[in-house]
Amino acid sequence: VRAENGPTCIVMRPSADDPNKTKFTWLLSIDLKGWIPKTIINKVLSQTQVDFANHLRQRMADNSVSKEMAPAC
């Protein structure tokens, strides 16, 4: 499969409503260039993004991850 990645961006900003929360915005543009219908691809990709966010949330909540270890962008 020869996929093409378009513009992709992850933005994390403090929540305006709760200082203990972060607003996570992920823009993803990918064309898999295959025969699979785009409706199926979009559903799978959106679920993959949800899974990624859940794993990220779980990792950040883990007590073994300290703020000092978090990489800077």
Swiss-Prot record:
It catalyses: cholesterol(in) = cholesterol(out). Pathway: Steroid metabolism; cholesterol metabolism. Its main location: mitochondrion. It is found in: Mitochondrion. Signal peptide: none annotated. Pfam families: START. GO terms for biological process: cholesterol metabolic process; intracellular cholesterol transport; regulation of steroid biosynthetic process; steroid biosynthetic process. GO terms for cellular component: mitochondrion. Transmembrane segments: none annotated. Keywords: Lipid transport, Lipid-binding, Mitochondrion, Steroidogenesis, Transport. PROSITE patterns: START (PS50848). Residues 1-65 form the START domain. GO terms for molecular function: cholesterol binding; cholesterol transfer activity. Plays a key role in steroid hormone synthesis by enhancing the metabolism of cholesterol into pregnenolone. Mediates the transfer of cholesterol from the outer mitochondrial membrane to the inner mitochondrial membrane where it is cleaved to pregnenolone. May interact with TSPO. This is Steroidogenic acute regulatory protein. The gene is star.
